[in-house]
């Protein structure tokens, strides 16, 4: 299955990524090869092969719910370049810079 450069640009725009024309061409080629390789799996005869739903025998392994001391805020904020109202200030990632 051929992935077009237009499809790469569309997914990049949805992901808020930008690529040069050469990168777009390279991604289209690479993604096409990956999809072709995955499509080869459809040709494998799996008759009689048990369904594999997980590779691990254990399920729902969780740690004990024990309260632990967190990181000291003063120590944490020593290396923070920008802070505002006791929060770490980071660059906006939304177009209008508003709330999510």
Curated annotation (Swiss-Prot):
Similarity comment text for this entry: Belongs to the GatC family.
Reactions the enzyme catalyzes: L-glutamyl-tRNA(Gln) + L-glutamine + ATP + H2O = L-glutaminyl-tRNA(Gln) + L-glutamate + ADP + phosphate + H(+); L-aspartyl-tRNA(Asn) + L-glutamine + ATP + H2O = L-asparaginyl-tRNA(Asn) + L-glutamate + ADP + phosphate + 2 H(+)
EC number: 6.3.5.-
Subunit structure, interactors included: Heterotrimer of A, B and C subunits.
HAMAP family linked: GatC
SUPFAM superfamilies (UniProt xref): Glu-tRNAGln amidotransferase C subunit (SSF141000)
Annotated GO biological process: glutaminyl-tRNAGln biosynthesis via transamidation; regulation of translational fidelity; translation
Protein name per Swiss-Prot or TrEMBL: Aspartyl/glutamyl-tRNA(Asn/Gln) amidotransferase subunit C
PANTHER family, per database record: GLUTAMYL-TRNA(GLN) AMIDOTRANSFERASE SUBUNIT C, MITOCHONDRIAL
GO molecular function: asparaginyl-tRNA synthase (glutamine-hydrolyzing) activity; ATP binding; glutaminyl-tRNA synthase (glutamine-hydrolyzing) activity
Source organism, top-level taxon: Bacteria
Keywords: ATP-binding, Ligase, Nucleotide-binding, Protein biosynthesis
InterPro entries found in the cross-reference section: Asp/Glu-ADT_sf_sub_c, GatC
Task of the protein: Allows the formation of correctly charged Asn-tRNA(Asn) or Gln-tRNA(Gln) through the transamidation of misacylated Asp-tRNA(Asn) or Glu-tRNA(Gln) in organisms which lack either or both of asparaginyl-tRNA or glutaminyl-tRNA synthetases. The reaction takes place in the presence of glutamine and ATP through an activated phospho-Asp-tRNA(Asn) or phospho-Glu-tRNA(Gln).
A matching Pfam family: GatC
């Amino acid at each position: 299955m051929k992935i077009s450069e237009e499809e790469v640009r569309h997914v990049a725009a949805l992901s808020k990524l930008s690529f040069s024309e050469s990168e777009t061409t390279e991604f289209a080629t690479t993604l096409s090869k990956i999809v072709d390789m995955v499509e080869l799996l459809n040709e494998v005869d799996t008759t009689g092969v048990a369904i594999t739903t997980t590779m691990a025998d254990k399920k729902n392994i969780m740690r004990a719910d024990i309260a632990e001391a967190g990181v000291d805020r003063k120590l944490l904020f020593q290396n923070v370049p920008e802070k505002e109202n006791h929060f770490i200030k980071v660059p906006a990632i939304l177009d209008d810079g508003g709330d999510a």
